[in-house]
Amino acid sequence: MSFEVLEKLEAKIQTAVDTIALLQMEVEELKEEKQQLQNEAQELREAREALEQRAQQVQQEHAAWQERIRSLLGKMEDVE
């Protein structure tokens, strides 16, 4: 093989190595981003569950107050 062919081959190999290194860095960045998104998704799920529980609690409180009001109105009608 001639010296020129070896130089071209070396340049191609170096380009491939550089490309692989860049791709590895990109993969690491994507892994970190994925982990951050998974964490954020988990936090959002937990927040949604907390809101759903609070909404259910408020509905129960609302129903209890409605029942109390009905009871008081019934007592007022009995007094009249």
Curated annotation (Swiss-Prot):
Keywords: Cell cycle, Cell division, Coiled coil, Cytoplasm, Septation. The keyword Transmembrane does not apply. One of its GO terms (biological process) is FtsZ-dependent cytokinesis. The keyword Coiled coil applies. GO terms for cellular component: cytoplasm. It is found in: Cytoplasm. Homodimer. The ends of the coiled-coil dimer bind to each other, forming polymers. Interacts with FtsZ. This is Cell division protein ZapB. The lineage of its organism: Bacteria, Pseudomonadati, Pseudomonadota, Gammaproteobacteria, Vibrionales. The gene is zapB.
